[in-house]
Swiss-Prot record:
Belongs to the class-I aminoacyl-tRNA synthetase family. The keyword Lipoprotein does not apply. This is Arginine--tRNA ligase. The gene is argS. It is an enzyme of class 6 (ligase). The lineage of its organism: Bacteria, Pseudomonadati, Pseudomonadota, Gammaproteobacteria, Enterobacterales. It is found in: Cytoplasm. Keywords: Aminoacyl-tRNA synthetase, ATP-binding, Cytoplasm, Ligase, Nucleotide-binding, Protein biosynthesis. The keyword Aminoacyl-tRNA synthetase applies. InterPro entries: aa-tRNA-synth_I_CS, Arg-tRNA-ligase, Arg-tRNA-synth_N, Arg-tRNA-synth_N_sf, ArgRS_core, DALR_anticod-bd, Rossmann-like_a/b/a_fold, tRNAsynth_Ia_anticodon-bd. Monomer.
Length: 577
């Protein structure tokens, strides 16, 4: 149920009847304050100016045509021409009933699209570090939301599995296997990469062999392809452990590494030349873009093939966008890549559009994000100044949550404590990130993220268990409750009901903008409204059974909404805390 969309259409029709143009924008928004109703239509200012009349005069005319019978109990004009809409309690009650009767809580499915989501993208032969956290969990929240809404989502894990460093890595893997009698497990990927690089820098014979191996790998030699595949397998097996711990939905089947696009690169360069978009410049192949200027104010040259014949990330990203449209049949492509890559992506996509590889009707969207910073405001590092491994961060989250949970539940059985600590610890790390606007940098702070008050995972998980505890005390089953009517008489009941019915609007914003913090803010607000409702509207000690059951149903929809909302974020809920 999208009340905002329903009201927008009603107000728009009334505006047209009052003389506004057919493309007028009613600008219906959720009201910021209770005294302004549940929704406010702010579109009179802009339209009145075009019509040469006072906004309040237009608002008065709109009201004569606005039929919100059965939807609103009161509609009033405020200030210079805002229209405040107060929802009818009977309308709220009816739609709370409908939401409870639906597995999807009354959320409609929009027109189905095929949406490719590019996220996570770790590198082969390197361990995942904190720099991979934001892309992985923000991207996964977008995927979960889009899938819930009914879209066909293709997860694309754009793994860094190609490049000149693979000659060095294969040579080192070969050396290790010879010295360790055949098969070996790479327990320490970081150490493996570091040792390979050290040998490459210090041993000229090893470096020469590594350079030869690159050529053989790139020419498709089966032995070197096999060694390369082994490195990819070892890395992705380790990464899968991290994905599973993080409760993200990525699997090995979602890997679409850089190497996938290699066969396309020569054809793309040739095609861009044939179309007159790419030219030779100082031995390299370059596309000059008028949209981007260099320091001299001239069109910027973007290299797509080096003079030695090598390709660049830009070439791969052009091929990647083309593949996602032509082969995966994407209607929309979302990239969860940090903000420092913005110009690079814009240049690649400008070439993609000019070449006609992806039509303008298919959006290519860079859902960029800021950096994770330490308390000192600098990039998050270890005490020694090194990169923080993601596995180490999750270990610490689990350890801190374990202590916290044990403190509050000294008699909890060990297996239950471990399960709860995992949900709280991992949930805290994820929620702390997801609850911030992704476009900004944010400060990583253990004390804040593990607090049981404020907009945190432990608070949200606790809020959910608190609602469930009402049901345990009520000793009533869902079947008995289903037949009971919802009656809304108190203001706090109406406020909670209206907020519950705004779940679809919240999902729609997250799906459109890729902003999970909007869902976090909604759920936190919902938990606060339930808290006020619980305090001022007695549930179990209500004046009669009808009121008791009605309030239990509001509590029931709150629990279901909190659980489903947290699930779209990839945050686990627990029954007891």
């Amino acid at each position: 149920m999208n009340i905002q969309a329903l009201l927008s259409e009603k107000v728009r029709q009334a505006m047209i009847a009052a003389g506004a143009p057919a493309d007028c924008e009613p600008q219906v928004r959720q009201s910021a304050k209770v005294q302004f109703g549940d929704y406010q239509a702010n579109g009179m200012m802009a339209v009145a100016k075009k019509l040469g009349m006072a906004p309040r005069q237009l608002a008065e005319q709109v009201l004569t045509h606005l039929d919100l019978n059965g939807i609103a109990s009161k509609v009033e004009i405020a200030g210079p021409g805002f229209i405040n809409i107060f929802l009818d309690p009977a309308f709220l009650a009816e739609h709370v009933q409908q939401a409870l009767a639906s597995d999807r809580l009354g959320v409609a499915t929009p027109e189905k699209q095929t949406i490719v989501v590019d996220y996570s993208a770790p590198n082969v032969a390197k361990e995942m570090h904190v720099g991979h956290l934001r892309s992985t969990i923000i991207g996964d929240a977008a995927v979960r939301t889009l899938e819930f809404l009914g879209h066909k989502v293709i997860r694309a894990n754009h793994v860094g599995d190609w490049g000149t460093q693979f000659g060095m890595l294969i040579a080192w893997l070969e050396k290790q296997q010879q010295e360790n009698a055949g098969e070996m497990e790479l327990a320490d990927l970081e150490g493996f990469y570091r040792d390979a690089k050290k040998h490459y820098d210090e041993d000229e014979e090893f470096a020469e062999r590594a350079r030869n191996y690159v050529v053989k790998l790139q020419s498709g030699d089966e032995y070197f392809r096999e060694m390369w595949r082994k490195l990819v397998d070892i890395t992705m097996t380790q990464n899968q452990i991290t994905y599973d711990r993080l409760n993200v939905t990525l699997t090995r089947d979602d890997v679409m590494g850089e190497s996938l696009y290699n066969p396309m690169l020569p054809g793309i360069v040739a095609d861009l030349k044939a179309k007159g978009l790419a030219v030779e410049s100082e031995g390299a192949t370059v596309v000059f873009l008028d949209e981007f200027k260099n320091k001299e104010g001239e069109p910027m040259g973007v290299i797509i093939q080096k003079k030695d014949g090598g390709y660049l990330y830009t070439t791969t990203d052009i091929a990647c966008a083309k593949y996602r449209y032509e082969t995966l049949h994407a209607d929309r492509v979302l990239y969860y890549i940090d903000s420092r890559q913005h110009q690079h992506l814009m240049q690649a996509w400008a070439i993609v559009r000019k070449a006609g590889y992806v039509p303008e009707s298919v959006p290519l969207e860079h859902h960029m994000f800021g950096m994770m910073l330490g308390k000192d405001g600098k990039p998050f590092k270890t005490r020694a100044g090194g990169t923080v491994k993601l596995a180490d961060l999750l270990d610490e989250a689990l350890e801190r949550a374990r202590r916290l949970v044990a403190e509050k539940n000294p008699d909890m059985p060990a297996d239950e404590l471990e399960k709860l600590a995992n949900a709280v610890g991992i949930g805290a790390v994820k929620y702390a990130d997801l609850s911030k606007n992704r476009t900004t940098d944010y400060i990583f702070d253990w004390d804040n993220m593990l607090a049981f008050e404020g907009n945190t995972a432990p608070y949200m998980q606790y809020a959910y268990t608190r609602v469930l505890s009402v049901f345990r005390k009520a000793e009533i089953n869902e079947e008995q409750l289903a037949a009971a009517p919802v009656i809304i008489r108190e203001d706090r009941e109406a406020q909670l009901a209206a907020r519950l019915l705004q779940f679809e609007e919240t999902l729609t914003v997250v799906a459109r903008e890729g902003t999970p913090h909007v869902m976090c803010a909604y759920l936190y607000d919902l938990a606060g409204l339930f808290s006020g409702f619980y305090e001022h509207c007695p549930i179990l000690s209500a004046e009669n059974e009808e009121v008791r059951n009605s309030r239990l149903k509001l509590a029931q929809l709150t629990a279901k909404t909190l659980k489903l909302g947290l699930d779209t974020l990839g945050i686990e809920t627990v029954e007891r805390m």
